[in-house]
Amino acid sequence: MTRACDLACAHCRAEAIPTRDPLELSTLEAQALIDEVAWLGPPPPLLVMTGGDPMKRPDLTELVAYAAGRHVPVAFSPSATPLLTRGVIAELKAAGLKALSLSVDGSCPQIHDAFRGIPGVFERTMAAWEAAREFEIKVQINTTVSRLNLFDLPRMAHIVRPSPWVTWNT
């Protein structure tokens, strides 16, 4: 959806940049893409809105609602920045969001935030996860395993396993 992102993740493969690229799809172009995805059904495949950080798109809620109106299930993979709030998650759920993909690269702020390059990301991730539970949104936890966090996987498992709404990808 966008390459724009406010994090500085050590492993980023999206070549994230602080602001949106002018060549990104416009709202109308994104809606046309959703129309094409809708034709791939029935049922249409899950559309995962990712980036960068999809929260950097001001039309995110509009696009989720548009997809829901076309019976295209939507998940999104946000960055845990101040843009990702409980209110925004509630708004996206009301628009039709089915699933949320969060990155958890450590069992504590020291490990996770070092991986993400910005302090406070772990706490925002946990808050987003809690909001998703509250609104009964399925959550996929993604973990990039490296030498920085391999030793921490057992502790991360204790965080992830208790939730029936979660899939964990490592």
Residue ranges and their predicted role:
Residues 54-55, 80-84, 98-119, 147-148:
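Conserved radical SAM core fold
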Residues 7, 74, 109-110, 139:
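Glycine-centered loop/turn positions within well-structured domains
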Residues 25, 58, 120, 148-151:
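Residue-level signal for the nucleotide or nucleotide-sugar donor/cofactor binding architecture
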Residues 2-99:
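Conserved alpha-helical substructure of the radical SAM core
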Residues 91-95, 118-120, 158-160:
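Short, hinge-like loop/turn segments at secondary-structure boundaries
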Residues 87-90, 112-115, 152-155:
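Short secondary-structure transition/capping segments
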Residues 17, 107, 144:
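Conserved sequence/active-site signature of Rossmann-fold short-chain dehydrogenase/reductase
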Residues 40-49, 70-77, 98-101, 123-170:
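Conserved C-terminal portion of the radical SAM core fold
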